[in-house]
Amino acid sequence: MLVAADQLDTRLYGPPVRPNLPPGFGTRYTWKTSKSTADRSRRSIYIHAKRNLPYPLLRVFDQPDMHESCARRPQTTIAPQALVLLNSELVLDLSRGVVKRIQDATYSKNIPARVRHAWLTVLGREPQKDELAGGIQFLAEQSTRSEAKDEVTRANDALLDLCHVLINTNEFLYID
């Protein structure tokens, strides 16, 4: 997701990253959030590890138990994973990063070009004819659902929804 949003910080080494924790974690065992957005764009291997407070996003996606060694990690596909990807503010922010890349690369009124660029950016391939048609139709329908007053904002809201959907596809999440 960080690569698709063009936000991955590839620096090696350095201090651990302390991402935002969801509300409701209290204050006793939490950590002070990293201030730099660049720090929050580093690989998950740099996320601060606290045995009694695993990072919730990683926990949902099979983070190993930090109390004992594990020779092999299980792979699961469970409903909370899909819910996190659909509802996480982090995933939505990364979708906004993808939208910015598309806006920087395409003319806003060229809808087919925006759909093609979304597919290339998120999935790494051109959309097939039916996918292109579906993407164009999706943008048209979503822009009418937006509560924004001006046409450009409605179009950008629809593009954000498309990018969010593409990030949630099996093709993006799983390597064949």
How should each PLM-predicted stretch be described?
Residues 162:
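Globin-like tetrapyrrole-binding proteins
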Residues 145-152:
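Short helix/loop segment immediately N-terminal to the Walker
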Residues 133-144:
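Amphipathic alpha-helical segments that form the core helices of the histone-fold
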Residues 133, 150, 157, 166, ...:
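Basic, alpha-helical terminal appendages of large translation-related enzymes
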Residues 80, 136, 156-157:
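Generic N-terminal initiation segments characterized by hydrophobic and/or small/turn-forming residues
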Residues 2-122, 126, 166-176:
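An acidic, gly/pro-interrupted, aromatic-rich
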